[in-house]
Amino acid sequence: MRILLAAAVAAAAVAAPAFAQDAAPFTGARLGVTLGYDKTHDRDGFTYGGAFGYDYAVAPKITLGAEATFEDSTTKGDGIRASRDVAISARAGYVLTPKLLAFAKVGYDTTRFEIADEGHNNLEGVRYGGGLEYSVTPRTYISAEYRRTEYEDHFGGRDAGIVGAGFRF
Protein backbone atom coordinates (compact mmCIF):
# COMPACT_ATOMS: atom_id res chain seq x y z
CA MET A 1 0.00 0.00 0.00
CA ARG A 2 2.85 2.38 0.82
CA ILE A 3 4.42 1.73 -2.56
CA LEU A 4 1.10 2.44 -4.30
CA LEU A 5 0.69 5.70 -2.32
CA ALA A 6 4.29 6.75 -3.09
CA ALA A 7 3.74 5.99 -6.78
CA ALA A 8 0.53 8.07 -6.80
CA VAL A 9 2.29 11.03 -5.13
CA ALA A 10 5.19 10.78 -7.58
CA ALA A 11 2.81 10.64 -10.55
CA ALA A 12 0.90 13.68 -9.27
CA ALA A 13 4.13 15.62 -8.74
CA VAL A 14 5.30 14.87 -12.27
CA ALA A 15 1.91 15.76 -13.79
CA ALA A 16 1.43 19.01 -11.81
CA PRO A 17 3.61 21.14 -14.11
CA ALA A 18 1.31 20.23 -17.00
CA PHE A 19 -1.48 22.15 -15.26
CA ALA A 20 0.65 25.27 -14.92
CA GLN A 21 0.01 27.87 -17.59
CA ASP A 22 1.89 30.96 -18.58
CA ALA A 23 0.32 34.20 -17.44
CA ALA A 24 -1.93 35.79 -20.01
CA PRO A 25 0.00 38.17 -22.23
CA PHE A 26 -0.24 41.89 -21.48
CA THR A 27 -1.26 41.44 -17.83
CA GLY A 28 0.17 42.67 -14.56
CA ALA A 29 1.92 45.82 -13.42
CA ARG A 30 4.02 47.80 -15.89
CA LEU A 31 6.43 50.72 -15.74
CA GLY A 32 7.77 52.57 -18.76
CA VAL A 33 9.22 55.70 -20.31
CA THR A 34 7.58 57.81 -23.01
CA LEU A 35 8.77 60.21 -25.70
CA GLY A 36 6.80 61.89 -28.43
CA TYR A 37 5.61 64.78 -30.56
CA ASP A 38 3.29 67.28 -28.88
CA LYS A 39 1.11 69.97 -30.48
CA THR A 40 -0.89 72.65 -28.64
CA HIS A 41 -2.36 75.81 -30.21
CA ASP A 42 -0.45 75.36 -33.47
CA ARG A 43 2.83 75.11 -31.54
CA ASP A 44 4.77 71.88 -31.41
CA GLY A 45 7.53 70.33 -29.39
CA PHE A 46 8.51 67.14 -27.61
CA THR A 47 6.90 65.44 -24.66
CA TYR A 48 8.76 63.04 -22.37
CA GLY A 49 8.06 61.23 -19.13
CA GLY A 50 6.92 57.98 -17.63
CA ALA A 51 3.90 55.74 -17.21
CA PHE A 52 2.79 53.22 -14.62
CA GLY A 53 -0.14 50.87 -15.12
CA TYR A 54 -1.80 47.60 -14.31
CA ASP A 55 -3.66 45.39 -16.79
CA TYR A 56 -5.86 42.38 -16.11
CA ALA A 57 -7.11 39.76 -18.59
CA VAL A 58 -10.90 39.53 -18.29
CA ALA A 59 -11.08 37.07 -21.19
CA PRO A 60 -8.43 35.25 -23.24
CA LYS A 61 -8.11 38.18 -25.69
CA ILE A 62 -9.45 41.13 -23.67
CA THR A 63 -7.62 43.19 -21.06
CA LEU A 64 -8.79 46.02 -18.84
CA GLY A 65 -6.50 48.26 -16.87
CA ALA A 66 -5.56 51.60 -15.39
CA GLU A 67 -2.63 53.88 -16.18
CA ALA A 68 -1.03 57.00 -14.72
CA THR A 69 1.34 59.17 -16.75
CA PHE A 70 3.69 61.93 -15.62
CA GLU A 71 5.22 64.00 -18.40
CA ASP A 72 6.74 67.36 -19.34
CA SER A 73 6.87 69.18 -22.67
CA THR A 74 9.07 71.54 -24.69
CA THR A 75 6.07 73.00 -26.55
CA LYS A 76 5.98 76.80 -26.36
CA GLY A 77 5.10 79.93 -28.29
CA ASP A 78 3.26 83.27 -28.00
CA GLY A 79 4.14 83.55 -24.32
CA ILE A 80 2.67 80.14 -23.41
CA ARG A 81 4.70 77.06 -22.53
CA ALA A 82 3.18 73.63 -21.90
CA SER A 83 4.68 72.22 -18.72
CA ARG A 84 3.94 69.32 -16.38
CA ASP A 85 1.20 66.94 -17.44
CA VAL A 86 -0.42 64.30 -15.21
CA ALA A 87 -3.12 61.91 -16.41
CA ILE A 88 -5.05 58.93 -15.07
CA SER A 89 -6.75 56.73 -17.65
CA ALA A 90 -8.78 53.54 -17.99
CA ARG A 91 -7.49 51.25 -20.72
CA ALA A 92 -9.14 48.42 -22.68
CA GLY A 93 -7.15 46.15 -24.95
CA TYR A 94 -7.66 43.39 -27.49
CA VAL A 95 -4.90 40.81 -28.09
CA LEU A 96 -4.41 40.70 -31.86
CA THR A 97 -1.58 38.14 -31.69
CA PRO A 98 0.27 36.66 -28.70
CA LYS A 99 2.75 39.56 -29.02
CA LEU A 100 0.53 42.46 -30.18
CA LEU A 101 -2.15 44.33 -28.23
CA ALA A 102 -4.42 47.04 -29.64
CA PHE A 103 -5.75 49.39 -26.96
CA ALA A 104 -7.98 52.39 -26.39
CA LYS A 105 -8.00 54.63 -23.35
CA VAL A 106 -9.92 57.50 -21.81
CA GLY A 107 -9.26 59.47 -18.66
CA TYR A 108 -8.62 62.67 -16.75
CA ASP A 109 -5.71 65.01 -17.48
CA THR A 110 -4.30 68.09 -15.78
CA THR A 111 -1.63 70.22 -17.44
CA ARG A 112 0.24 73.25 -16.19
CA PHE A 113 0.76 76.01 -18.73
CA GLU A 114 3.36 78.67 -17.93
CA ILE A 115 2.07 82.06 -19.13
CA ALA A 116 4.46 85.00 -19.60
CA ASP A 117 3.86 87.84 -17.13
CA GLU A 118 1.02 85.89 -15.47
CA GLY A 119 2.63 82.86 -13.84
CA HIS A 120 0.90 79.58 -14.55
CA ASN A 121 -2.53 78.13 -15.15
CA ASN A 122 -3.56 74.52 -14.48
CA LEU A 123 -6.10 73.21 -16.97
CA GLU A 124 -8.09 70.00 -16.67
CA GLY A 125 -9.52 67.96 -19.47
CA VAL A 126 -10.51 64.63 -20.93
CA ARG A 127 -7.78 62.55 -22.55
CA TYR A 128 -8.57 59.80 -25.06
CA GLY A 129 -6.58 57.82 -27.56
CA GLY A 130 -5.41 54.46 -28.75
CA GLY A 131 -2.41 52.53 -29.90
CA LEU A 132 -0.47 49.30 -30.12
CA GLU A 133 1.75 47.53 -27.62
CA TYR A 134 4.27 44.91 -28.76
CA SER A 135 5.68 42.34 -26.34
CA VAL A 136 9.40 42.10 -27.15
CA THR A 137 9.90 39.51 -24.39
CA PRO A 138 7.45 38.27 -21.75
CA ARG A 139 8.59 41.14 -19.49
CA THR A 140 9.48 43.96 -21.91
CA TYR A 141 7.37 45.92 -24.37
CA ILE A 142 7.42 48.80 -26.82
CA SER A 143 4.38 50.87 -27.70
CA ALA A 144 3.06 53.59 -30.01
CA GLU A 145 -0.07 55.65 -29.47
CA TYR A 146 -2.00 58.72 -30.49
CA ARG A 147 -3.82 60.71 -27.84
CA ARG A 148 -5.89 63.87 -27.67
CA THR A 149 -6.72 66.02 -24.66
CA GLU A 150 -9.73 68.37 -24.69
CA TYR A 151 -9.26 71.10 -22.07
CA GLU A 152 -11.85 73.07 -20.13
CA ASP A 153 -12.79 76.72 -20.67
CA HIS A 154 -12.68 76.51 -24.47
CA PHE A 155 -8.88 76.42 -24.30
CA GLY A 156 -8.79 73.93 -27.13
CA GLY A 157 -6.99 70.65 -27.37
CA ARG A 158 -3.65 68.99 -27.45
CA ASP A 159 -2.48 66.21 -29.74
CA ALA A 160 0.43 63.87 -29.14
CA GLY A 161 2.07 60.95 -30.90
CA ILE A 162 3.89 58.88 -28.29
CA VAL A 163 6.33 55.96 -28.35
CA GLY A 164 7.29 54.09 -25.23
CA ALA A 165 9.27 51.21 -23.80
CA GLY A 166 8.86 49.45 -20.50
CA PHE A 167 8.85 46.43 -18.24
CA ARG A 168 6.09 44.24 -16.83
CA PHE A 169 6.51 42.75 -13.39
Residue ranges of model-derived segments:
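Gram-negative outer-membrane beta-barrel domains
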Residues: 17-169
